[in-house]
Amino acid sequence: LERLLGGGWSGAVILLDYGKTLAQCLEGSPAGTARAYRSHQLSGAILENLGSQDLTCHVLWDRLEPILVAQGFRSVRLERQEAFFVKHAGSAMERIMTSGDNEGTGRLRALTHPAHFGAKFQGLSGIR
């Protein structure tokens, strides 16, 4: 991340993923957050079927936030994905919701509804 953010370029960085702080991981997931998915099915056997299943784990936001600050980003903020979209793309969301495009509306709901990705994913952002 330090290499990606280096070089003195100006602009915004937006990282969207699901994650926790280290304290949240230690308290709520002491065995870790690594999971495997094969054919859209959750598996606890993360070392089996290597190459034919997806591996995933939570991002540690409190390890990434200081990197943004050290690289000169300001207004560094961690928000739930739904709040991030409402704050930064509210008018675009409104256009989608009133467009009559059922597919687009469904995708937007999946990204922002708290029962779907809205509460599970977060956005870490900063500007320089």
Regions found by a protein language model. Give the residues of each.
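Long, Lys/Arg- and hydrophobic-enriched amphipathic alpha-helices
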Residues: 1-128
